[in-house]
Structure formats: C-alpha cells, structure tokens
Amino acid sequence: PKAGVWISAQVMKNSDDFKFRFYDEVAKRPAWLTGVCHAPWVSHTMKECRERTPMDLPIRSYPDICHLLCCQYPVHAWDPIWAITAGRECYNPRPRWHRQMHRLNKPYCIGNLAYSEGIADDVSKFIWLDADWDDSIPYMKTLQDYARMFISPQHAAEIASTIALFEDIYEGPAVSNQAVSEVYKQLHVLEDAMHAESYEAGYGADSYRFQMPRLMSTFYQYIQRRAIRDKAVFDGVFQGLDEASDMDAFAETIRTRLAETAVSPDEALKAELWSLGDVCWEKINWKLSTTRHFSPDYSRGGFLDTADIPLCNAWWLEANLKKLSGMATQAEKQTFLKQLRDCHTAGPGGKYISFGSPESMQYLRMEKTWWEEPEAITIPRIEQHVGMFGPDVNRETSPDIDKTTLERVSSILGYYHAPVKIEIDGLVPGAAYEVRVVYPMRFGWKGQKDIPSYITVDGERLAFLGCVEGDEWVYRYALPAGKVNAEGRVTLEAQKDVGPRGTGFTEVWMLLR
C-alpha cells in the first residue's frame, strides 16, 4: 500500500498533445506518483522534462547503453560498413561518449538506471556506475580499475587504453581506419604477455572480459580486409563497358568479377574469429551467431553471421543484371549498364550526396554538435537502416534487392521537431534544377504521392514531380531558377506534416535542368 510509481513520457507514436497532457497529469500530483523517468523514445530533452516537472518531484534517467544504431544514443556518422556488420548489439565500449552523456544528464536527474540487454555493454555499465558514484573520476581511471579487477593488475593501463581505442574505430571510413589494426595488434601483444604469466582460472588471457575485445577486434580486422577487397572489386567491375560490343558477354564478365566478393579474403583470420566466438559461447553463452551460438537473430547480437556478406553493391548489381534478358537490343542493354554504372553521379553542374559518406557531413547545418547533444532530439542524427543487407535476406524473393545499395544505409534524420537542413554548394548560380531525394528508408516512403514529408527552399515548398520510374524510392522535385545564389549554393530543408516521427535525407541528386 505504500508503493510509489515512477512514470515516463515514452511513447512510440508521439505528439505534442501527448506531451502536454502527460505533464498536465504530472502537475496534479496524484498520491502514488513518486517521480518521473526520462528514457529512450521520449520526444524531448531531459532539460525540458525537468522544466515541465514540479521541482520537488525527482527525475531518474534510464539511458540506453546497449545499442549503437536505431537507439537513444547512436554512433553518429558511423560508416555503413560497420552498421551492416557489427550492427546494433555488438561489443560496444564507448567510455568517452558515455561520460559525456552522463555529464549532460547530471544537472537534471537524481541518478541513472541504465537500460541494458546483456553482456555486450559490459564496459559501459561500469562507466555509468562509476560516474554516478563519483563523477570526478576520469573514465580512463574507471577502465584501469575494470582491467585491474577482472583481467590483469599488471597490465591494467595497457588494457584500459586499448579498450578506449575502440571508439576511434567508430569514426571515419572503415577501409582506411588505422585504429582497427592498432587495437588488434595491441590485444595480441597483451594476450601473449599474459599467457607467459601466472593467473588463476578466469583471469589474464583466460578472462572472458579480455576475450570479448579480442573477438571484436578480430571481427573489425576481418571486416576491414573484406571491405578493402570488395571495394577494389566493385571499383573495377564496369571496366571496359564503353568498348564492349556484346553486352550479354560483358554481363558475364561482371558476374565473374563479382564472384570474388563471395570468397573469404583471409581464411586464417576468419577461423580465428569463429574460434574466439566459440570460446565466448563456452565461457558465458554469448549468443554471437544464429548458427552456432543460438542468437535469435543476427540483429540481436548475432553479428558473426554478417562475416560473409559482400561489402559493396554486389547483390544490387547482380539483381539488376537479370533485367538484361528482357531487353531486345545491344544498344538498350549498354544504355542500361551505363545507367547502373553512373547512378551515383549527377552530371555537369550537378551534385550527388549520400549521407553514408564522410564528405556529406560538410553539407549539414545544425544549431549544435552531436557532442553537445548526443541524444539528437532537437538536432538531426545519422540513422542507419540495415535490414536489407542482413544475412537472412532472400536475394531471390526480396522485392527491393535491385534498389538496395550501401548509399541507402545512412540517413540524416530529424526526429520530432528537429530541423533537417543541408546547404549544397558547387551549383550553377541562378539555374533551375531537378532535385531527387531518397527519404530515410525506415519510413517506407516509396512511390506514394501523399507522403507526410516535403522539401522547402527559403520557406517555399518545392513542386513534386513524381517518383523515378523503376526506382520509386526516389522522389523528384522542381527547384525554380533563381533559388541557387550567386555563390552556387542552396539550402534544402526536409519538412514533415504533423504526426510522423520524423523526416530527412538519405540520398540527394541535384540535376541541372
């Protein structure tokens, strides 16, 4: 009878009306109300939550510490390669960012009860616990204590610095990230050193808390090698197209070239990876795959299943090559193949942007940085849509495999009321353009005339021209002459009607008319 209740403004289909009614009820102070929670899928910041909650009612934070994408605190600007492989629930130490999240939360709440879904966020649990105990403790001290307690007192500093280095893997292009090999090498050196020393069972190199980063570093090393190889294959797949006369024969050449992406780039490293996975399964029942470790799904921590997927647009190209059989002439087939080759270009005076590329970040216009607001509620975020690259996708029956490219994994997405603005340069001053847009894939806006989103320039809504025939994910708009300024720049804003959770951009083409 003396129990109290904590309530949260979490709701999947949010609206301002719900928010206002929620806090109206909080203000009535029912006798059973003990406090308010701030958690994932609350449509407003903790600061606003505190401002709307009576000051004598405490607020408790429930941060999501276990996910890297489609979550409360995503890894912003994550390379699509990592998103489709490591995925949402891999081993995910983020000490630097999690301490920043805690620092931003602290003024508005009485403490944190982290939302966890298992062992993958093991390091983050200690980062948050230590910060709640004493927020003056540097996160490197927390990592050293963690390593000293659970792995090796002799190597606490080296282990801590190596775990911290995982965050550098999340930044920049996967194919050129030097932190990948650095972490892998450092953990090998530490393993050799600890094997030469004496530890009780379950400590040193035998500690599962050491085997977890060992496995993850091996995974990143393997995926990077695969990504480098697959990129090289795809970069050369259309070589010779302009000179070819027999398009059916050239299509077979493409298939032969793409076949290399189905082969492991390093069998020894792959064997090491799966061996470590088996060790972690035996030690702690870590469900790393659906085939050997009983994960319910690859997206629920079974990320080892992604080790064999091609890390280029091989599936997309193979699906489109099948369309050649329905074309009558060599000229028609060659035109189609050239369209596939050039689909991510915009022609003279134009511009193509995919928000999975590091270069795309230069076009974003935000009032704050992600470091200042990692939850990205009042500012847009980079959101990842990875389902079409899953190892469980049936490439024969999936209706959109011929439209699924790496360029469509990442979106700049504004939830709720976050403005989504991009300033595009390099255009022809004063010229008219056709603007082509792929919206965030998670909303499923494909070929619909009445979607609750649209594009504006200088506050004026652009005229909708329909969708691209054959690829209805692409929406077409008319940018009138005079909107591109004298410096060759124009600012596009993705807007939404009242109701949907958000909007944004995945791909943008600016085609000179």
Predicted features by range, described:
Residues 1-156, 160-161, 242, 246-312:
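Catalytic-core regions of glycoside hydrolase
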Residues 23-27, 90-95, 157-179, 490-498:
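A broadly tuned preference for mixed-charge, low-complexity surface segments
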Residues 116-124, 136-351, 358:
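C-terminal non-catalytic alpha-helical accessory regions
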Residues 20, 50-51, 72-76, 125-127, ...:
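Surface-exposed beta-strand edges and their flanking turn/coil or helix-capping segments
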Residues 339-513:
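Extracytoplasmic
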Residues 7, 36-38, 59-61, 114, ...:
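Generic structural hydrophobic/aromatic packing signal, biased to beta-strands
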Residues 12-14, 80, 106, 142, ...:
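Bulky hydrophobic/aromatic packing residues
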